[in-house]
Swiss-Prot record:
The protein's name in its UniProt record: Phosphoglucosamine mutase
Residues that bear Phosphoserine: 103
Catalyses which reaction(s): alpha-D-glucosamine 1-phosphate = D-glucosamine 6-phosphate
Alphabetized PANTHER family for the sequence: PHOSPHOGLUCOMUTASE (ALPHA-D-GLUCOSE-1,6-BISPHOSPHATE-DEPENDENT), PHOSPHOHEXOSE MUTASE
Homology family: Belongs to the phosphohexose mutase family.
Length: 444
């Protein structure tokens, strides 16, 4: 596949104001995207939503200027979770949706992510076409006068998205729930949905100021939520990240409930035959699924790979420990608030609690060793390394697993070993890491 110049695995992301997220470049991106969308649909409209970062307004204005300069009509949705933009893209029949967000990153960062007409990921071919159009922007014939696009503010976006979420909410009457909204995109939507479902809700981090998104809060900083739940006698707590495409729970005792727990609970309640997760998913989940006659499909790390495998196999349920969980029969993209609601629906259907789930799914000990090498690509095919891995697998005897994977950004090999005996897995990881280090130092 042709290598991308600007788009990463999750759109374009950088420090706001630095290339490529400068107003001039984002305007060029908007013009390029507008040109591509107009080729497909001469009456194209694009919806734009954003999280609560202070740079969102600047980038939104630049993007809208570029899109309208090519004759595309822009519909502003305002502050809305990323999956809400996906929902409105398909609900309004837009040619595309755009989210201005950097998810769980600090406020200085921002990003631009596109959805296709159905609210799913923009195709690789379309992304490459947009990249080519950016580089050709100077040669495009100008659009003028009545042919320019319009800009409107859609004031019903939050209400419609909230109604969609509420349609999937169980009856939460009598439940005391604490929410951490990360000062992000879900700060209004999440408390409203859980209150409408009947829960007694205590919501924190619901006062965004443009700079406090994810700061010491949200799904990557859950210590405060755990304390609130323990000391406040809540049934459970739920934390979202800045753009609310993921969710993590804590049980009534403050224990972390992550994606592996949610996948087990949902697979049982929804009658799934198989679940898709990643190579980092704990083996305890695999064992529990096997006991229930279910299979676990593993992919590379990243929710996009989980998504691709679900589509390829015609499956519905998959996710990662981070709280990115996909229910493709309900939504084409990860949705933190929806994930929380569907998880609670599964819990109520099975008549269980998050406390019981935590106690049942006891994670296998896992150790990770990073080894610096000269050529990370050559390590996988090195005979000595392959022999060391084979020896490790024999020692684990089906009661554990070993995985070697290269870092995406550094010349590192990550050696992960998982098993029932913590001392044994540390010894195995050290032995394999030593071989990797020796072979890696030699350039393999």
């Amino acid at each position: 596949m042709t290598e991308r110049k600007y788009f990463g695995t999750d759109g374009v992301r950088a420090v706001a104001g630095e290339f490529p997220l400068t107003p001039a470049w984002v305007m060029a991106l908007g013009a390029a995207a507008g040109e591509v969308f107009k080729r497909r649909n001469p009456r194209a409209s694009v919806v734009i939503g954003k999280d609560t970062r202070q740079s969102g307004d600047m980038l939104e204005a630049a993007l809208a200027a570029g899109l309208t300069s090519r004759g595309v009509n822009v519909v502003h949705l305002g502050v809305l979770p990323t999956p809400g933009v996906s929902y409105l893209t398909r609900h309004l029949g837009a040619e595309a949706g755009v989210v201005i967000s950097a998810s769980h990153n600090p406020y200085e960062d921002n990003g631009i992510k596109f959805f296709g007409p159905g609210g799913g990921k923009l195709s690789d071919a379309t992304e490459l076409e947009i990249e080519a159009a950016i580089d050709e922007a100077a040669t495009l014939a100008p659009v003028t006068g009545v042919n320019l696009g319009s800009v409107t503010n859609y004031t019903e976006a939050e209400r419609l998205y909230t109604a969609f979420l509420s349609s999937h909410a169980p009856d939460l009457s009598g439940m005391r729930i604490a929410l951490d909204c990360a000062n992000g995109a879900a700060y209004r939507v999440a408390p409203k949905v859980f209150q409408q479902a009947g829960a007694d809700v205590f919501a924190v981090y619901t006062t965004p100021d443009g700079r406090n998104i994810n700061r010491g809060c949200g799904s990557t900083h859950m210590d405060h939520l755990r304390l609130i739940v323990r000391e406040g006698d809540y049934d459970l707590g739920i934390a979202f990240d800045g753009d609310a495409d993921r969710a993590l729970f804590v049980d009534s005792r403050g224990n972390m409930i992550h994606g592996d727990h949610m996948l087990l609970l949902s697979a049982r309640a929804r009658g799934e035959k198989a679940v898709v997760a990643t190579i980092m998913t704990n083996m305890a989940l695999e064992v529990k699924l096997q006991e229930a006659g279910l299979t676990l499909e593993r992919t590379a790390v990243g929710d996009r790979y989980v998504h691709e495998r679900l589509h390829a196999k015609g499956l519905n349920l998959g996710g990662e420990q981070s709280g990115h969980v996909l229910f493709l029969d309900v939504s084409p993209t990860g949705d933190g608030v929806l994930t929380a609601l569907l998880t609670l629906s599964s819990m109520k259907k099975l008549g269980t609690t998050l406390d019981a789930l935590y106690d049942e799914l006891v994670m296998f000990p896992q150790t990770l060793v990073n080894v610096r090498v000269k050529d990370k690509k050559a390590i996988a095919s090195d005979p000595a390394v392959q022999h060391a891995v084979a020896d490790a697998e024999k020692q684990l005897a089906g009661k554990g697993r070993i995985n070697l994977r290269p870092s995406g950004t550094e010349n590192l090999i990550r050696v992960m070993v998982e098993g029932q005996d913590e001392g044994e897995i540390h010894d195995i990881a050290a032995a394999v890491a030593k071989v990797v280090e020796e072979r890696g130092a030699a350039g393999a």
